[in-house]
């Protein structure tokens, strides 16, 4: 008989609720401090991995007990994931960190069918969970007791001053192809709506990002991993797995001219991606994450219906918010344009959920792709038949013959 060991981390709600606090996510009004309790069932004598494949936490939200079930996101990284930065003298340094035992999870709340969760457990619990239609953020508190966490609603994060923040894609960038509404698509009731597809993603952080995060490579990597975990979650409704295959950090200088004109920077990044990046790393899509302030309150820009094109399967995104969830929404939005999605109406809702493809970013309860976005995506698949997103990310043997089939020319291919 297997003996079950319960590993318990003190469960309690801190004896007060705070009215205001400064957290990594910004200035937060109305939060509560909780101590999550981790419950792990292990056979007697078993060696506990640092990050288990499945975990369960108990905590109290608004005074009510909540059980959070988490499962490791095993599709977050490609198996040949790499990280690249540069020495002060311009020497390129590429490493292949082990990602088998990573700390990024997705999950749900027990007894809440509409719940979701996207959590990093690298240093405490950090991320979001959707409970009874409300979006909550959780992050560790820097207190004498290391197990204390803040839980707060996204709507309680103070909004930044200034006008609405917008995507830079306009009608001038869009084609006028007829689309199929999601409700009109012929889906086999015994099959999923969309066949499973895979996007191998490269993210490049520019030199301003490196300086913004005080030359701390680890901080940039951790932030990007958190964000991609959110992106991966959003795209599950389309049966798309977004896997990070390389994270590049321009630690010594910018390798294109990064300017406040989003259109010019996007054009330059696309040229660099085709002439340089594509020869360095197999990928389907590349995003430039920049700390420059883009003109006209623009948060990002992308080409429409360009996935698998070696020059235009790119986006640029401004690092506009300390909240990883909101950065994930923006980056998922711009990627959506590459996958054929046009903008929703500015007040688009899917039930009580905000539509990801709204033209402007609005902090809300939660985010999903609309039926129209799904229709645009299906039309893109039908018209363009993108091949690069059909292949599942696999480990690449650097001495093996390059494998084709992704519409992007690999080094060594004809």
From Swiss-Prot:
Coiled coil: none annotated. Binds 1 zinc ion per subunit. Zn(2+) binds at residues 333, 337, 343. Its cofactor is Zn(2+). Expressed by the venom gland. GO terms for biological process: proteolysis. InterPro entries: MetalloPept_cat_dom_sf (IPR024079), Peptidase_M12B (IPR001590), Peptidase_M12B_N (IPR002870), Reprolysin_adamalysin (IPR034027). It comes from the Eukaryota. Residues 21-190, 394-414 form a propeptide. Residues 1-20 form the signal peptide. The active site is at 334. One of its GO terms (cellular component) is extracellular region. Keywords: Calcium, Disulfide bond, Hemostasis impairing toxin, Hydrolase, Metal-binding, Metalloprotease, Protease, Pyrrolidone carboxylic acid, Secreted, Signal, Toxin, Zinc, Zymogen. It is found in: Secreted. The modification Pyrrolidone carboxylic acid is found at residue 191. Disulfide bonds join 308-388, 348-355. Ca(2+) binds at residues 200, 284, 388, 391. Its EC number is 3.4.24.-. It is an enzyme of class 3 (hydrolase). The keyword Cell inner membrane does not apply. Belongs to the venom metalloproteinase (M12B) family. P-I subfamily. Snake venom metalloproteinase that impairs hemostasis in the envenomed animal. Monomer. PANTHER family: ADAM A DISINTEGRIN AND METALLOPROTEASE DOMAIN (PTHR11905), DISINTEGRIN AND METALLOPROTEINASE DOMAIN-CONTAINING PROTEIN 28 (PTHR11905:SF32). This is Snake venom metalloproteinase. It comes from Crotalus molossus molossus (Northern black-tailed rattlesnake). The lineage of its organism: Eukaryota, Metazoa, Chordata, Craniata, Vertebrata.
């Amino acid at each position: 008989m297997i003996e079950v060991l319960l590993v318990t981390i003190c469960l309690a709600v801190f004896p007060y609720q705070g009215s205001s606090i400064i957290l990594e996510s910004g200035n937060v009004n109305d939060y509560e401090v909780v101590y999550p309790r981790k419950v792990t069932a292990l056979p007697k004598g078993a060696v506990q991995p640092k990050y288990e494949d499945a975990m369960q936490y108990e905590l109290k939200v608004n005074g009510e007990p909540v059980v959070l079930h988490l499962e490791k996101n095993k599709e977050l990284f490609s198996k040949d994931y790499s990280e690249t930065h540069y020495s002060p003298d311009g020497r390129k340094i590429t490493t292949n960190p082990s990602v088998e035992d990573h700390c990024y999870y997705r999950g749900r709340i027990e007894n809440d069918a509409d719940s979701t969760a996207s959590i990093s457990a690298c240093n405490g619990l950090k991320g979001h969970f959707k409970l009874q239609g409300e979006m909550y953020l959780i992050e560790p508190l820097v207190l004498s007791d290391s197990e204390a966490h803040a839980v707060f609603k996204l709507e309680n994060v103070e909004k930044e001053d200034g006008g609405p923040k917008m995507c830079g894609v306009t009608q001038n960038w869009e084609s006028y192809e007829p689309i199929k509404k999601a409700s009109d698509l012929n889906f086999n009731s015994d099959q999923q709506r969309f066949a499973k597809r895979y996007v191998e993603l490269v993210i490049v952080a520019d030199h301003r990002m490196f300086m913004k995060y005080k030359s701390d490579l680890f901080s940039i990597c951790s932030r990007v991993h958190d964000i991609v975990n959110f992106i991966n979650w959003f795209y599950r409704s389309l049966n798309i797995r977004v896997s990070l295959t390389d994270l590049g950090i321009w630690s010594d200088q910018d390798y294109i001219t990064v300017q406040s004109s989003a259109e010019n920077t996007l054009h330059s990044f696309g040229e660099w991606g085709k002439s340089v990046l594509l020869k360095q790393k197999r990928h389907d899509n590349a995003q430039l994450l920049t700390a420059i302030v883009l003109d006209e309150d623009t948060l990002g820009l992308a080409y429409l219906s360009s996935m698998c094109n070696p020059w235009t399967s790119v986006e640029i995104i401004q690092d506009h918010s300390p909240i990883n969830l909101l950065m994930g929404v923006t980056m998922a939005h711009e990627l959506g344009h590459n996958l054929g999605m046009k903008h929703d109406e500015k007040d688009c809702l899917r039930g009580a959920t905000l539509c990801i493809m709204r033209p402007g970013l609005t902090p809300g309860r939660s985010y999903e792709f609309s039926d129209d976005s799904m229709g645009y995506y299906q039309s893109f698949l039908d018209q363009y038949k993108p091949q690069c997103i059909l292949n599942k990310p696999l480990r690449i043997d650097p001495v093996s013959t390059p494998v084709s089939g992704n519409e992007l020319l690999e080094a060594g291919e004809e």
